[in-house]
Amino acid sequence: MRLFFKFFYLSNEGFDNELCGNFKSPCKNIGYLFNNSRVDKNFNSTFYFSPGIYNLSSSIIIIDFQVGINLIGIGENKKIIITTHKGTRGVISYNSNLIIRGITFDNCKVKKNEFPLYVPETLTDYSDDKLDYLTLNYYIGTGGALQIVYSKVYISNCVFSNNKGRNGGAIFTVLSNITISDCIFYSNQALMRSEDGGNGGAIFFGLSTNAIILKSIFKNNMAITGGVIVQSNSELRVEDTVFAYNQASNGGVFLIFNDSKIESTRCSFYANYANISAIANIQNSFAFQKSCLYQENMASAMGGVFSLVDRTILFVTLSIFNDNYAPSSLIVENHGSGLAMFTNCEFTFSDNFKRQIIQSLFSISNYNFLLLKDSRVSNSKGNVIWCTSNAIIVVYNTTFYNVSSKVINIHSQGYFFSISTTFIECKAEDYLVVLRNGARGILFRNNFIDNNGILMVFTTYNSSMIIIESKFFNNIVRNELIAVRNEYTLQIYNSIFKNNIGKTRGCIISVDQLGKLTSTNNYFINNTSVYGTIINFVKKRFNYWHTDFQCFSTFKNDTIVNNTALVSGAIVYYRDKIIGTKYTCESCLFLNNIAHFGNNINSGFHSFSVIQASKVHSNEHFPALIYAFDQFDNLIRGKNDIRFHVSSCDDIHLTGVTSSTIQLNGVTALYNLKVNSPENHFCNLSYKSNPKKGDVKLPISILNCPQGEEMFDVSYQGKVFQCLKTIETSNIAKTVMIITTSILVLLILLCFGITIAYSKEKVINFGNIVFLILMLFSCLFLCIIIYVSIEPTNFSCQFSAIVFPIGIGILFTLTLLKQYKIYKLFKYSDFLKINTDNLKMVKYAGLIMVPVFLLVLIGVIVYPSKPTFILDLHTKTATKYCISRKYYVFSIVIVVYEVIILLTSCFIAMKSKRYHSTPGTFYESLFNSILIYNYTLVFIVLIPLFYTLQNNPTTIYLIYSIGSSILVFATLSIIFIPKINFLFRRKQIVSTLKKTIETQERDIQRNKDLLIFYKMFLIEKKNNNFNNNPIFNIHETFSSEDEDEDEEDDIGEGIYSLFNHWDQNKRKYNNNQIYPNQIPKQTTNSPSSQSIDFLNNPTIPKNKSINNLPNLFKKPKKKLKSKIISKSANSSPNINNNTINNNNNNNNNNNNNNNNNNNNNNINNNNNNNININTKRRKSMDPSLDS
């Protein structure tokens, strides 16, 4: 056939006329040439476009130009731009041959057809369905730049940008052959949302289209489905093409359906996006991908790269998948029933790839087939293969490296075949291979090396796994390498397990005895676990499939060497009871397998026994030893997860350490157990364990308390009974105090008898017999307390609480009144009326004791003291005390009150100190003061002891007893013993006093002579006009106090006054005058018949006259200085020891006169030397008698 060619030139600067179209005179509009019949269909016409923008007002319509139409751009394609008015398509090719080269189609947008539908006659043999598909579904508004129907089109070096169409934003083809080479498709769109629109953002390859795309770029194209290309019943071959940043709702790059075919070679897919299928959504079609790169493509729902539906076949080889993402499936979402095969592919994820939700790389949810061969998956963070159907999955010679989740996860009755697969350095947070719900799996010559995770292989729910000639080296698992559950079938042949570690349970195999386990010709070497290094039989679970399923296990020709269990079960460990037969291995080699706390075969906790005492005292400590055993009667050693608890029956209260955890040695103890119940009770203690393994009940009975102990309820809430040793007052203390008190009682009675018998004696009468009797009765009451307080009873507690404070109060009160009366009488010089009126004394004592009586009465009535046992559980003793809840408050008030009485007494005693040795008082003031001081000292010591030492009955009794005894003894020894001594040793006392006085007189006379001589010497010196001579005032009584008060005086005045005083006494004596003490004269002159209280007045001897004295002793003519010589230290009258001496000497003189002794000179001299010479004070004084 002969071809004819025509050439036309077009330019924006050209003119449309009959002569245009040549190089020198180009036409402006290509439509002018077609509309004016200048283009002959029998010629191959070529249109050359000069650089410029050609804005078409109507489409370039090419119909039946089978010889050929060529649209050629001159120069750069970017400078030759064909665009159209809004709503106008660029080129329409019907039944033609078209070549387009070097032209840019920009912003061509079509909404409807401008030309009636052309259906070639050759289509009349098509079925009505296809004609309907062609004319109605995809024809209207398609192909913004090109619409190609039943044509052959070759496009090269063109740019399609910003074009829009209902289907096929740039190109739409039907029944055509199209080749696209070296083109760029940029920002084309198919987004019309009317029915059946929005398909193929760049190209729509429709019915019976054969397309080839070479070395092109598709970027930023957009559609509802098929962001770049939609294929429907067409074939496409793509080579060396780049697809980047395209997006769609479904199929970010391709939407391939309706028996289409696509073959992609050396293509790159980068950062494409879709909701479903970031690259291709393939439905009922065939896709072949070779040597392609898929990087960072993303689907928001599923199918990060591919989605397969219906009978689709996908074959991918020699391709790389890097950082693609979809939450459901990063690579393939397969809902079809076809095949998906990946060979020699690499699936990688960079360190920067961080997504929160990753389900899997391959998701299979229908009956289909997946082949992963000669590939590598690395750094995956999700499941690699997820299957929820009965699909067939084959993994051959593939490596899984650093996978952090499951590699195979089959949830239904699928089939998994792994051949020559390697799992290396996977750090799975879960399992690597999982088969569930009847799935079947075979691992043939697989390698598990340096992996770390929970498990490597897991099958459950009637699933089966066969492992043949596989190797498990250097893996670390939390549980075991292989775990099978619930009617499983696990068969392991000719495999090696070496240097694996199980961190928490077993190491190699974990089974639940509800399946079939076969191990033949395997090697288990240097593996380590906690329990059951080789096989760990865990607790059985519910049988989901058959209730009569039995376990069958076969172990044959295995080699088990150098395996270690950190706790127990170096080879086998049963966590639950044995259901089937025990582990036995035929023709197996066991060598150097070690369990640190067990044997080669052990089981978990199976039973326990308890050792406890069968008879104890109530609330007595006793231990219970518990031993835990496994099913092989070995102690459960090395565990601490078994807890035991003991409980008692209702009528016995149990305390102590009632719960405990098993120790590493398999034994635990419940320490300090105590059962509390009255005597002779019986109970069964129930011991329980957790995990529960049946109760152990042991009888225990409550014994009677041993001798010397009693049963007490030691709890504030009751029901806690304990035998305690009763602490009583020491027998030695009782004996000693009873003897001591008895002696004191005898002394009291003796004193009482003597007081009554000698009541008229002055020494008794002077002390006030009522006072003495009351004191004796108070002492007797205190002694009675000692007898009564031996044993705490209701009476003794009340009696002691009443009598003790009242008794010591009476003693303190009487001594206070006595001392006060003595002080008052001497202070007002009424000392001669020393006897206190009895009625007044009783009255005053009663008034002082009223507060004590009231406080004791109120305290005893409101808070009565009762005997109560005080329990000390630390020492296991019970001590009986007299206790009142708040009586101590009243007792403190009473103590304070009585301390006030004592302090007042002490104060008065200190004020009365100068009256202690007053003559004629029998030293009542002195002895009473001493008694007060003793009372105070004893009471101050007794009170703190009484309130602090309350923890022992012996101590309390001794405080009462010794305190009372000391008070009684002090009273008797200070008040009564001196009087009794005076009554029965009167002569001896008088004789002793006489000798003492005579000795004192001689000493005084000698000293006085020396002083007078010295005085005379000084006077003589003074008369000789010596200057600065010391002048001494010599007091004739030699009182230190007088020396301090006297002024310097002349010695002559002193001597004159002395003899003048003697003369006055002489006259009084001769006239039978008696001193104011009104002591009657004695009728006899015998010393023995005279009372010790009677003292004669001193006299001046008659044979001595004052006139006969030397001049030195005469009264000087000058007037005497008035002065106060001395104040007595004892009383207001000037009565002192010198006076006593003088009186005694006078008595001696009288006796000597009656016996006609001539010793008057000596007597007078003695009297002269010992008489006080204070004349002024003497006039107001009366002599007193001294005892």
Curated annotation (Swiss-Prot):
Gene Ontology BP, a term: gamma-aminobutyric acid signaling pathway
TM helices/strands, residue ranges: 736-756, 769-789, 797-817, 844-864, 889-909, 926-946, 956-976
One GO MF term attached to the UniProt entry: G protein-coupled GABA receptor activity
Pfam family, one: Beta_helix
CDD domains on file: 7tmC_GABA-B-like
Biased composition, class Low complexity, residue ranges: 1125-1174
Bilayer topology term: Multi-pass membrane protein
Glycosylation sites noted in the Swiss-Prot or TrEMBL record: 35, 44, 55, 177, 258, 275, 397, 402, 462, 526-527, 557, 562, 684, 794
Key word Chaperone present: no
Induction cue: Up-regulated by P.aeruginosa, PAO1 strain and PA14 strain infection.
Annotated PANTHER family: GABA-B RECEPTOR (PTHR10519), METABOTROPIC GLUTAMATE RECEPTOR-LIKE PROTEIN Q (PTHR10519:SF68)
Protein family per UniProt: Belongs to the G-protein coupled receptor 3 family. GABA-B receptor subfamily.
The protein, known as: Metabotropic glutamate receptor-like protein Q
Organism: Dictyostelium discoideum
